[in-house]
Design a protein with these regions (language model features):
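Acyl-donor (CoA/ACP) binding surface of acyl/acetyltransferases
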Residues: 1-21, 56-174
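A short helix-loop-beta-strand connector motif used in the catalytic cores of GNAT acetyltransferases and
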Residues: 43-56, 65
C-alpha cells in the first residue's frame, strides 16, 4: 500500500470505484459525485482546500481508495476513508489510517482525530473498533462534532475519536 497526492489522472479509476453500489451506498454519494466529472471536482476540492489533507490509496499502481483528514484545525481533524469493495477486509484501511494518523499527530501535532460513520454503516464502525486505539461513541463528549458529521451525512451517526497519546502508545507497542 502506498499513498499518493491526488491527480486528475485518477478521476476515471476513482469514479469506477465510487460507482460500485456498495461503496456508493456506504458513502451516501449522490449520482453526480460518482461520475468522472464528480471525481475531478472532488480532486480539485481536496487539493485546493488548506483545511484538508487527502491522499489516493494505491496497491502497486492500482488506485484502491481515498483517505482524507478534513476540517483540520490547530488541535483536531476528522478522518475519512473509503476503499473499492474488492479491497474491503484486506488490511488496507488500517494501514492507510496508521500512515495518515502518524502524519496528523507527528507532523501536524494534532491532539485528536475524529472518526465517525453513519449508524447503519456497521462495517465501517466495526473496522474503527478493531483498530484498538479508537475511543468509541464519544458524541456526548463532543456534541458539536457529532452534529457536524450528521449534517454532512443527513443521518444519525456515531462519533469516535483517536487521541494522540493512545495512538502513539499503540504504535510504540508494535
Amino acid at each position: 500500500m502506498n499513498l499518493r497526492e491526488h491527480d486528475e489522472r485518477y478521476a476515471e479509476a476513482m469514479s469506477a470505484l465510487t460507482s460500485q453500489p456498495a461503496v456508493k451506498e456506504a458513502l451516501g454519494l449522490p449520482d453526480d459525485m460518482v461520475t468522472v466529472e464528480g471525481a475531478k471536482k472532488f480532486i480539485w476540492h481536496v487539493t485546493t482546500d488548506e483545511r484538508q489533507y487527502s491522499r489516493a490509496i494505491f496497491d502497486g499502481d492500482t488506485l484502491i481508495g481515498v483517505i482524507t483528514l478534513k476540517d483540520i484545525s490547530a488541535e483536531s481533524a476528522h478522518i475519512g476513508t473509503w476503499l473499492g469493495e474488492q479491497y474491503w477486509g484486506l488490511g488496507y484501511n488500517e494501514e492507510a489510517k496508521s500512515a495518515v494518523l502518524a502524519y496528523a499527530f507527528n507532523v501536524l501535532e494534532l491532539k485528536r482525530v475524529f472518526a465517525g460513520a453513519a449508524k447503519r454503516n456497521i462495517r465501517s464502525l466495526k473496522a474503527q473498533e478493531k483498530l484498538g486505539y479508537v475511543t468509541m461513541d464519544v458524541g456526548k463528549r463532543y456534541p458539536i462534532d457529532l452534529i457536524t458529521i450528521e449534517k454532512i451525512t443527513g443521518e444519525p451517526c456515531q462519533l469516535n475519536v483517536i487521541l494522540r497519546d493512545n495512538f502513539l502508545a499503540q504504535v510504540a507497542k508494535r
